[in-house]
């Protein structure tokens, strides 16, 4: 059986925290900022954790990431 390969697109988008959770950045941060409030833009800068429902699926893609 060949080795499992890490999904490289996912590896660039998600980072594992010290407690084993996955950290991700927000969407809607590339353009069209004139339509967003300052509060929205400030909140979008912060990273957040992957939700429980998506965690198992993403973990399979990142099986080999430390």
From Swiss-Prot:
Biased composition, class Basic residues, residue ranges: 1-16
InterPro entries: Ribosomal_bL35, Ribosomal_bL35-like, Ribosomal_bL35_CS, Ribosomal_bL35_sf
Superkingdom of the organism of origin: Bacteria
Gene Ontology MF terms in the entry: structural constituent of ribosome
Protein source organism: Anoxybacillus flavithermus (strain DSM 21510 / WK1)
Top-level taxonomy: Bacteria, Bacillati, Bacillota, Bacilli, Bacillales
Protein name per its UniProtKB record: Large ribosomal subunit protein bL35
GO CC annotation terms, alphabetical: cytosolic large ribosomal subunit
Cited HAMAP family: Ribosomal_bL35
Gene3D superfamilies according to UniProt: 4.10.410.60
UniProt region (Disordered), positions on chain: 1-24
UniProt family annotation: Belongs to the bacterial ribosomal protein bL35 family.
A Gene Ontology BP annotation from the UniProt entry: translation
Gene: rpmI
Keywords from the named record: Ribonucleoprotein, Ribosomal protein
Pfam families xrefs: Ribosomal_L35p
